[in-house]
Amino acid sequence: MCGIVGIYLKSKKFEKSLGGMLSKMLVSMESRGPDSAGFAIYNRDKNKLFKYSICLNEMNFDRFKKEIKKKIKFSKLEKNSDHVILKSIEKPSKIVPILEDITEISLVGYGKSIEIFKQVGKPSNVVKKFDLNKFSGSHAIGHTRMATESAITTDGSHPYSTGEDECLVHNGSLSNHNNLRRKLKKNGSKFNSDNDTEVAAGYISDSLKDRNLKQTLKKGLSDLDGFYTFIAGTHSGFAVLRDEIACKPAVIAETKDYVAISSEFQAMAHLPNVNSAKIFEPEPGVVYSWGK
């Protein structure tokens, strides 16, 4: 059992409040996932730089800064607890291999919009650690994890990002992730954990080479074996999919200003004007998407 949450803002008037809205949603899902938590915030860099989200793990920030100066031309390093957002004009094709070669750190996401933060611990502590309330943006996705099939580590936490400005959170389990992992590795995909959700994220990234997000998730109904509710994010918005059995809960609240999704309605009870929202459960096997 895990908790998933997401907000897509239709109106810009709530952009500065996005972090605060999401933080309450995450904390309310602590009972569904007390082992770790994480979130992805989409907020395009004003200078159109690429943003690389990095977990330092046990590496000292000063040592990381000293080492990275030798290898990468960057504009800014923004430290937030044990995470760093590296901003650079350099494209991912050049920067990603360099960061992946530094074995002491974990590259958890990259793109011109996305920033990812995740860590082991209770969601309430993770929210405070990264000061989620201060974040602004256009949309955001979050996850609280109760570990089942893989270790309780930062690399085992959601969201997973395996492509530029892409991320995925997942409540459920996949039974064919080992076979799918082997196939994706043959196509060049890389994985940092044994988590089934990372495989699903890799599958989506691989499929997006030839399809849009809605088509990719629809194809996943035949390729991904298991029980799941997905929230998949891109630079322009997000999409939601439940498997065709739909045993994993999800509820959506939509107003003229935002769309919110969570595993339980209680996570959305604090949102503005939620009492007048259109509230519904996503149908099994149907892709719902919102974006610009």
What are these regions (language model features)?
Residues 1-292:
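Conserved short alpha-helical segments that host acidic/polar catalytic motifs at enzyme active sites
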